[in-house]
Amino acid sequence: MEGRFQLVAPYEPQGDQPQAIAKLVDGLRRGVKHQTLLGATGTGKTFTISNVIAQVNKPTLVIAHNKTLAGQLYSELKEFFPHNAVEYFVSYYDYYQPEAYVPQTDTYIEKDAKINDEIDKLRHSATSALFERRDVIIVASVSCIYGLGSPEEYRELVVSLRVGMEIERNALLRRLVDIQYDRNDIDFRRGTFRVRGDVVEIFPASRDEHCIRVEFFGDEIERIREVDALTGEVLGEREHVAIFPASHFVTREEKMRLAIQNIEQELEERLAELRAQGKLLEAQRLEQRTRYDLEMMREMGFCSGIENYSRHLALRPPGSTPYTLLDYFPDDFLIIVDESHVTLPQLRGMYNGDRARKQVLVDHGFRLPSALDNRPLTFEEFEQKINQIIYVSATPGPYELEHSPGVVEQIIRPTGLLDPTIDVRPTKGQIDDLIGEIRERVERNERTLVTTLTKKMAEDLTDYLKEAGIKVAYLHSEIKTLERIEIIRDLRLGKYDVLVGINLLREGLDIPEVSLVAILDADKEGFLRSERSLIQTIGRAARNANGHVIMYADTITKSMEVAIQETKRRRAIQEEYNRKHGIVPRTVKKEIRDVIRATYAAEETEMYEAKPAAAMTKQEREELIRTLEAEMKEAAKALDFERAAQLRDIIFELKAEG
């Protein structure tokens, strides 16, 4: 069924999923602009949203606040919609260093993009899908509000080929070069084409295995086939094919000429300005860099960092709203914001963060002032582009609640698990009380998480627990990537019984073995003790049937009161449902393998664990770095960007130690 979403799932909606789906769908059909789904941890929010997408049948953009979540959502949605276009759109900078300059140390950092090719393919696959069909879901990080080329230009430059069409072979080659394809008869890869007599083979920018073979008879296209690029095996005949540009910043020749004139004019004005300020080094640097870029644009129609000239290429006035992925969607599209209490503040902050970094580059002659217009949307611009939007969170923020006419709740877990019980206990004698509670959990082979407010308190507590003979680990921000994952794995395996940390809301801490969460200094109002943070922290004990939370505090703050009441309210709803349906809560069974995918490379080589980096010979270290780099590329190819980023960090650490 072309153009319609087909949801494939081994189970039907259950618990309070059916009512949540019905309410959200009804709201969308009535034209409600903002809706909020308040879904408790582990209630199957992704499945609910998938049902909503399938029923309203609109192109959908799902925004997540980091690549880990985006990757997980992408995998889940791909399973639910195997017959539809589920795409993935993240910025190269989600993993790699953007261009920057540090004046204090006179350090210029070029943009570093190692696993660019895979991400680039996925981005092209996403934008081309939007022009070819309506049954499209794009899972994106917040970088989807970042500047992109003009969608009109992108659409107009598509090369459309049909069997029987009259076109000279050389005219086709010229058109391919215009949309940034390179002729390469030897190294045939994405974004290239090759020619053999009357046969032109094109490798689309959005593919990595299949290419298009166009066979001519004179000046007529005789047949079009889809071919395996490696083996040459014919995969199918095509009547029609659309070749999308190999860059999102493509521009027609006449527009490019105009853009180059405008860039030259801006360059002259800026050079005069810098020289008048006595900034001769900056002026020389800017002239050299910009003239080189202009030369590349004249010769190749492209240059490295072309996005910095996007305002000129699109002939937009200074300060105007940039084009972004949102402009590639049709007008009636739907936006889903996952974990909205974190994602919306991120969307809000992107413009300022980017502006500060670019301003330094402009001030020191690395970029023209127009580069400031290659930027993310401001939050107000983002709001103007919303057609209909659903915010999804266990703890929606004030913005979502203010804008949504009613909140749709999803409280019941398919596993029957309840929100944990909560105790508030005085701080006097809290550590000895905590030790008693931990020992009870150890007896039952369960684990404990303890959250403190300061680094010193965490360190002192860890030492004290060790002296009391408890197997404890301290998880803090300075711990290296690989170690962090190993500590979590060791907690699950029982090497540790307790994990002490300051911020337990970072990803990777949904551990079914944890039945007790202890919150020290619960009555100190602040970021980590706000009602939202408390509810999220309490949720860390909601994956175990014996889940319990102890807050150590001498007074009950407003945040504590709200968090406790909300948890009680949810627990009562869940208990009532379980009683009615005869459900017995069972702890989630989760393979320990899940947690340790990222240590795969280190386990493969065994070197990293068997020998500390300092003890390795130069040759051993280089060998390990090579292995890890290969593993990193494999991970990115498999879309496991979390692992790719972790491996990148490990490589960085190894190089630093060398």
UniProtKB/Swiss-Prot annotation:
Tell me which residues bind ATP: 39-46
| Positions of the Helicase ATP-binding domain | 26-414
Query: Which segments constitute the UVR domain?
Result: 622-657
Chief location of this protein? Answer: cytoplasm
Q: Which CDD domains match?
A: DEXHc_UvrB, SF2_C_UvrB
What positions does the domain Helicase C-terminal occupy?
430-596
Any idea what job this protein has? Answer: The UvrABC repair system catalyzes the recognition and processing of DNA lesions. A damage recognition complex composed of 2 UvrA and 2 UvrB subunits scans DNA for abnormalities. Upon binding of the UvrA(2)B(2) complex to a putative damaged site, the DNA wraps around one UvrB monomer. DNA wrap is dependent on ATP binding by UvrB and probably causes local melting of the DNA helix, facilitating insertion of UvrB beta-hairpin between the DNA strands. Then UvrB probes one DNA strand for the presence of a lesion.
Q: What is said about the domains?
A: The beta-hairpin motif is involved in DNA binding.
* Description of how the protein assembles with itself and partners: Forms a heterotetramer with UvrA during the search for lesions. Interacts with UvrC in an incision complex.
What is this protein's record name? UvrABC system protein B
Per the UniProt record, the lineage of the source organism begins with: Bacteria, Bacillati, Bacillota, Bacilli, Bacillales
